[in-house]
């Protein structure tokens, strides 16, 4: 079930939206034209969840709320208590990045938001979006250099395995290069996927290209440093989904 309702009178213009998924529902409400607040509720069963959602929607309509659509630029933000959740993700993100084990994990470091770097980037990105939409490539550089104090080291075209391994093992300010490389790539993945999760879009095809390159380098580093015996299935899934998103949404 999903319903979006709007109430207007001479003094106010408010929206209220509810959506169910399994035994959870999300309520998103506030002044129309803003992103409002998000709250997730959980029930013992899908039936109990659906029943309560229907009851709440009916009560709103009795108060004068009527069916309406959200503005096209409506943004989606996670509920702090529940964390990553499809119900607080943009419909476009849910369509193209559907694997919950890959896109909603908070502990798997191969996923977009499961590493500390990825989680911190998403948190900063949500704060940025609440103020004004950031330019994603500028935002990534700001997080890495401004918030973390690291050098910004994007993947290099045609870099050999030997060159990448040497870069990863070279020490800089007491840390091996791999620390900076992974920080860059995890921030890039989280920022690009996070922008789609929040707003349903990125700035350009170049953002998707950067995210795919970041995922590829994370995978290469893991094998070059013998952290993994084979390419990552998770990272392959992310690259595949990013490619499909770019192709089907007609990014330029």
Q: Which residue ranges define each predicted feature?
A:
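Amphipathic alpha-helical elements of HEAT/ARM-like alpha-solenoid repeat scaffolds that form extended
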Residues: 180-200, 239
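Short aromatic-glycine-(Arg/Gly/Cys) micro-motifs in beta-strand/loop hairpins
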Residues: 14-39, 106
């Amino acid at each position: 079930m999903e319903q979006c309702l709007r109430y207007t009178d001479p003094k106010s213009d408010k929206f209220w939206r509810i959506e169910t998924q399994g035994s959870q529902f999300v309520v998103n409400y506030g002044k129309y034209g803003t992103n409002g607040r998000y709250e997730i509720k959980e029930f013992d069963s899908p039936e109990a969840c659906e029943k309560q959602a229907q009851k709440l929607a009916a009560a709103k309509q009795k108060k004068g709320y009527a069916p309406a659509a959200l503005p096209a630029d409506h943004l989606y933000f996670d509920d702090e208590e529940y964390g990553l959740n499809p119900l607080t993700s943009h419909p476009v993100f849910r369509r193209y990045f559907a694997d919950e084990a890959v896109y909603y994990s908070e502990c798997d470091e191969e996923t977009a938001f499961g590493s500390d770097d990825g989680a911190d980037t998403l948190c900063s990105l949500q704060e940025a979006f609440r103020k004004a939409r950031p330019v994603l490539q500028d935002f990534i550089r700001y997080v890495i250099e401004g918030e973390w104090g690291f050098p910004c080291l994007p993947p290099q075209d045609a870099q050999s395995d030997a060159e990448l391994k040497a870069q990863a093992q070279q020490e800089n300010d007491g840390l091996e290069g791999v620390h900076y490389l992974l920080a860059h790539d995890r921030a890039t993945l989280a920022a690009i996927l996070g922008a789609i999760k929040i707003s349903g879009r990125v700035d350009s095809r170049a953002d998707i290209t950067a995210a795919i390159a970041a995922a590829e380098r994370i995978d290469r580093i893991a094998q070059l440093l013998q952290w993994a015996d084979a390419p990552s299935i998770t990272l392959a899934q992310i690259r595949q989904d990013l490619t499909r998103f770019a192709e089907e949404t007609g990014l330029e």
